[in-house]
Amino acid sequence: MAPLKLNSKNLSQIAAAGGALVKIPTYQRGRAVKEGIVHIGVGGFHRAHLAVYIDQLMQKHGVTDYAICGVGLQPFDSAMRDALASQDHLYTLIERSAKGSFAHVIGSINSYLFAPDNREAVIAKMAHPDTKIVSLTITESGYYYNENTHELQSEHPDIQFDLDPANEKAPRTTFGFLYAGLTRRYQQGLKPFTVMSCDNMQKNGSITRHMLESFARLRNPEVAEWIAEEGAFPNAMVDRITPQTSENDKTALADTFGIVDSWPVVTEPFTQWVIEDQFSNGRPPFEKVGVQVVKDVHAVEQFEKHKLRLLNGSHSALGYPGQLAGFKYVHEVMENPLFRKFVWQMMQEEVKPLLPEIPGVNIDEYCNTLIERFTNPTIMDQLPRICLNASGKIPQFIMPSIAEAIWVTGPFRRLCFVAAAWFHYVKGVDDSGKPFEVVDPMREELQAKARAGGNDPFELLSIKSLFGDDLRSDERFLKEITTAMNDIARDGIMKTLPKYID
C-alpha cells in the first residue's frame, strides 16, 4: 500500500496500515472543542511536549476546553503555517529509542494564526473568553531580558516599536501581543489569561512576569497594575530532547509507517514537566498525564537548576567543543571516550556539588539517565541545534556554575574549557579550518569581539548584558579561561581535552 498523506480523511486508513506501531487521535476536533490555549512559537519542542500532554488529555480524559491555537509571529513561521494547514493541523510524533520507533499522530493543535498576515486576529484570539492560557516557546532571545541588569531591554528597536501607541494594533514582539490581548480583556472585564512560559530558563515564569509588567508600565500603568494583581505566570521546568526534523526523518516515516507528513517531529521517550500551580483563569488537569504540578515555587526552581546546569550545561559541553572537533551529532561525541569521561567528570565534580538536594531525586541516577539519553543514536540530535542562540544559553547553563564555584572556592576548570570552546566557536571555523554557520541574535557583536580579542577572553567578557562585571575581575577565572583559549587555539579540541580529564 502506498504511503498516505496525513489528514483527517486518511486517519483511519493510516491507523489500520500502521497497526500497533501507530496511534491516532480519536477525539473530536475543530468546532467541537474550545481552544483554551494560544501558543506562540510552534516549533519542534512545543509539538513534542505541551501539545503531546494536551493530546493525551483529550484522548484519554475527554478534555475539550484546552485545544491549542498555534501562533507564528516571525516571517519564517509561514513554513509551519503551510505544513499544518496542508494536513488539517495534524502532525506525527516519531518516538525513537533502542527499543524501536513508534508513530503518534497528534491532534491537539486545532488551528494556526500567522501574525504577519493578520495581527488583529492574534490579538482578538488572545482576548476571546475561551482563551485561558497563552503559552510560549520563543527561545531566550524572545524575552528581551538583560542577563546583567535583569531588566527589559526597553531600548531594543522592536520593543520601542511596540511601545509606540500608534503600533498597538500591529505589534512585533511577544510582549506587544500579550499587552494588546490583555488590555482588551481588561477593557472587556475578563480575567487575564495565564502566561505560561515553556522555555528553558530558570525562573521562566518570574522573568516573563517582570518583562511584561515592565513593558506594560511603559504603556499604561493602570493595565500594568491589573496584570500585577490579577495575572499568573507559573514557573516551570521542561525537558524532552527534540532534534530538528530532517528529510531522512520524513522519508523514514513514509517508508516505515506509511505516513506522508510535511513536518513530523522526532523525539526521545523521556519527557518531564514540573510546573508551579499558579493559574489565573483555570487550567487543564495536567496531573492526569504525568505533569508534576507543585505548590511551592522553590521546588520548581530546584528542578530547573538541576536540569539547566546538568542537562543543558552538558549539552553545551558536547555542542561547542564537538562542533569545533568536527562531529555532527550528539551521540557521535558521546561515543568518544574522552568526551564521555569529560562530561561525566564535569557533572560530578564541578556541577553536582553546587546543586540543592531534592527529596526523592538521586542526582547520580539523574546523571546516568542523561548519559543514556545523550548516547541514543536513533534520534540523530544535531550539534548545530544544540549550539543555536548560545548568547541566551551560555549565561544560563555554564556561567552561573562558574560564578558559584568561585564563590565557594570549588573546581571549575572544565566549565571554563566549555566557555573557552564557545568563545572560539563564535568565530565560525572548526579546528580543521572548515567554516560553519553561527546562528545567534548577537552574532555580529560576538564575532567582532572575538576578532578583536583573539585568544584573550577579555573582549567577549566585556559584553555586560551576558557576563556582568564580576567574572572579569576574578583572577582565577581569567587565568583558567585564558589558558583554555590558548590551548584550544594552538592544539585544537581533541589534543586539549585530555588536560581536563583526571
Swiss-Prot record:
InterPro entries recorded: 6-PGluconate_DH-like_C_sf, 6PGD_dom2, Mannitol_DH, Mannitol_DH/Oxidoreductase, Mannitol_DH_C, Mannitol_DH_N, NAD(P)-bd_dom_sf
Q: Which GO terms describe its molecular function?
A: mannitol 2-dehydrogenase activity; mannitol dehydrogenase activity
* Keywords carried by this UniProt record: NAD, Oxidoreductase
Q: Which residues bind NAD(+)?
A: I37, V38, H39, I40, G41, V42, G43, G44, F45, H46, R47, A48
Which EC numbers characterise this protein's activity in its record? Answer: 1.1.1.67
In terms of Pfam families, this protein maps to: Mannitol_dh, Mannitol_dh_C
Give the reactions, separated by semicolons, that this protein catalyses. D-mannitol + NAD(+) = D-fructose + NADH + H(+)
Answer yes or no on keyword Plastid: no
Say yes or no: keyword Oxidoreductase present: yes
- Role this protein plays: Catalyzes the NAD(H)-dependent interconversion of D-fructose and D-mannitol in the mannitol metabolic pathway.
Q: Which family does it belong to?
A: Belongs to the mannitol dehydrogenase family.
Q: What does the subunit section of this Swiss-Prot or TrEMBL entry state?
A: Monomer.
Protein name, as recorded = Mannitol 2-dehydrogenase
Q: Which organism is it from?
A: Neosartorya fischeri (strain ATCC 1020 / DSM 3700 / CBS 544.65 / FGSC A1164 / JCM 1740 / NRRL 181 / WB 181)
